[in-house]
């Protein structure tokens, strides 16, 4: 299998796409996400119903706008949240992962390695930068080609930088947007909200400010 396809070719495009990612709290503080395109249409969602202890879960599920399961992200034990694996669709017993993610164990090195299993064009990616600061880049390990970026989002109408619960995921041409969002979910599980600042403005994205 070649190209940037890993999850679903519906989310691969010939031009760069900028998605708006919003962390949500449906009932409790947790790991819910909604993801919108530049027109304000829902693209992905992640729902958390586990109550106040949702961060203790070992699995996170990425769905499309219609609730179809695209990816299941599962913590690999024992790993203290440093190692995660991705499964296509809804994970079943005995199913093999399609990729693995591991955080560097070297003190002071802020990088994450993504290993893709199987016959794909690129078998390894690096995620560099600070997810907590919403400033990191996904690159092909061998070529250093950028395939996705996570950045702080600025409100187009006011030119004000939004809080870190709303940020941009920029997906390069030919790269699987569902795979990119799956990596965002893993980063959120690995790093959590440790670097998030308190008291920043929270704004729900709409078509006007996407």
Curated annotation (Swiss-Prot):
InterPro entries registered for this protein in UniProt: LOR, LOR_sf, Tubby-like_C
Superkingdom of origin: Eukaryota
Primary role: Might be related to the phospholipid scramblase and tubby-like superfamily of membrane tethered transcription factors.
UniProt record similarity statement: Belongs to the LOR family.
Stated name of the protein: Protein LURP-one-related 5
